[in-house]
Swiss-Prot record:
One of its GO terms (molecular function) is DNA-binding transcription factor activity. The lineage of its organism: Eukaryota, Metazoa, Chordata, Craniata, Vertebrata. Highest expression in brain. It holds the Pfam family Homeodomain. This is Homeobox protein Nkx-6.2. It is linked to Spastic ataxia 8, autosomal recessive, with hypomyelinating leukodystrophy: An autosomal recessive neurodegenerative disorder characterized by early-onset hypotonia which progresses to a pyramidal syndrome with ataxia, spasticity, hyperreflexia, weakness and loss of ambulation. Brain imaging shows cerebellar atrophy and hypomyelinating leukodystrophy. It is found in: Nucleus. InterPro entries: HD (IPR001356), HD_metazoa (IPR020479), Homeobox_CS (IPR017970), Homeobox_NK-like (IPR050394), Homeodomain-like_sf (IPR009057), HTH_motif (IPR000047). Residues 216-226 have a biased composition (Basic and acidic residues). SMART domains: HOX. GO terms for biological process: cell differentiation; central nervous system myelination; negative regulation of cell fate commitment; negative regulation of DNA-templated transcription; negative regulation of oligodendrocyte differentiation; neuromuscular process controlling balance; neuron fate commitment; pancreatic A cell differentiation. The gene is NKX6-2. Residues 132-155, 210-250 are annotated as: Disordered.
Length: 277
């Protein structure tokens, strides 16, 4: 080893010598990478084309000289085509291959549920966006059971006021009256008819409750009058002079109805308070 060369002591070890050889090899392989931007000179296109052999189909001049269809076919020639992929998939996943390999029947041929198709494949991505939902069905709004859901109409305060005033005058409307009222209120005849039917049902229930309450009150008043009349008759008998020898039953009945404090003052024999004491 020449020890007079500068840096010879650095290359005395085997690993450092290997690194030095790799650096020299890199310099010889990539001369343009080590030069500055000013010293870099791009090789001419004709020179590169001349260096490549004439039979090579991947040269720059050959690629640029091809038509568009031929270039695309040459570039994509190595990629597998869809038809080939489908045919190969049919070989592995077809019904004949399944039977030959001993697998059971495909899902489409099995009895029971129909094959499942994912919405993302059949309908595409827009089905996920609720803003792109389709219009409502023409038959009206459907509930969760699939039946048609009837929406209840709402009336304004002016319409309800006019209907109530008309109902106070008459509980039933004839055909011309109903048509005239519906036209004046901006409603349909069926709406007016249904409103009067519901209003009559409500009125009958309220009227029945009021009649039952009035009858109950009347019966209570009659019972009070009856009880008050019997008390008045007893008071009249109590104020009358009684014969102690013949009116013992009346005296006993009157004593039972009055307060027990009067028992000490009146005796059945007609004696006074002094006799009782």
């Amino acid at each position: 080893m020449d020890t007079n060369r500068p840096g010879a002591f650095v290359l005395s070890s085997a690993p450092l010598a290997a690194l030095h050889n790799m650096a020299e090899m890199k310099t010889s392989l990539f001369p343009y990478a080590l030069q500055g931007p000013a010293g870099f000179k791009a090789p001419a296109l004709g020179g590169l084309g001349a260096q490549l052999p004439l039979g090579t189909p991947h040269g720059i001049s050959d690629i640029l000289g091809r038509p568009v269809g031929a270039a695309g076919g040459g570039l994509l020639g190595g990629l597998p085509r869809l038809n080939g992929l489908a045919s190969s998939a049919g070989v592995y996943f077809g019904p004949a291959a399944a039977v030959a390999r001993g697998y059971p029947k495909p899902l489409a041929e099995l009895p029971g549920r129909p094959p499942i198709f994912w919405p993302g494949v059949v309908q595409g991505a827009p089905w996920r966006d609720p803003r792109l939902a389709g219009p409502a069905p023409a038959g009206g709004v459907l509930d969760k059971d699939g039946k048609k859901k009837h929406s209840r109409p709402t009336f304004s305060g002016q319409q309800i006021f006019a209907l109530e005033k008309t109902f106070e005058q008459t509980k039933y409307l004839a055909g011309p009256e109903r048509a005239r009222l519906a036209y004046s209120l901006g409603m349909t005849e069926s709406q007016v008819k249904v409103w009067f039917q519901n209003r009559r049902t409500k009125w009958r229930k309220r009227h029945a409750v009021e009649m039952a309450s009035a009858k109950k009150k009347q019966d209570s008043d009659a019972e009070k009058l009856k009880v008050g009349g019997s008390d008045a008759e007893d008071d009249d008998e109590y104020n009358r002079p009684l014969d102690p020898n013949s009116d013992d039953e009346k005296i006993t009945r009157l004593l039972k109805k009055h307060k027990p404090s009067n028992l000490a003052l009146v005796s059945p024999c007609g004696g006074g308070a002094g006799d009782a004491l």
